[in-house]
Amino acid sequence: ELLPAGEAAADEKIHARSVQLSSETHKLIAGIDLVEGEGSVVTPVEYKRGRPRDGAEGPEAWDADRVQVCVQALVLRDNGFTVNEAVVYYDSTKQRVRIPIDEVLVTQTLDTVSRARAAATAGLIPPPLIDSPKCPRCSLVGICLPDETAAMMRFRQEARGDDRQLTLFEPPEEA
């Protein structure tokens, strides 16, 4: 269990799993796989199944992963903790990638959050990816249903002006 910031002794080790916190300042909720640190200085750790991308100086976290852990850092900061870096652990390669929480990343993250909110309030759903190798590994594939959505969109375009019921499959040929 993660004690509120300031309640732990300055040298007390923190190791809390599956932490849920919110930020009133940023209107965000974060689920954090692991929070580790000492006293009120902590590091969020996010576990990913995949692998890091290859960077010029070695393994790097993907942009989406960097933004995710920055949200976690912002929420922790809003709850009184000091967060200077985050870690993404990639299970496929057993590598920990450290991410400094600097002003550039904070600005990028808040901009991403703002754009996500704008997209959500606009009510427009982005089109699904077509035959993307990312989809089967995505945690939202069961909600997004990219193949099914793309098929329905094709039928909807073909059926404009037609009052047929939309289906995923062509009706059987009549004998």
Located regions from the model:
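Residues that form generic nucleotide/phosphate-binding pockets
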Residues: 108, 112-119, 158
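Local cysteine-cluster metal-coordination motifs and their immediate loop/turn environment
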Residues: 133-146
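Short microdomains enriched in Cys/His and/or Lys/Arg
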Residues: 150-175
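Short conserved catalytic/interaction loops centered on acidic-Pro-aromatic/His motifs
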Residues: 81-84, 99, 125-128, 146-152
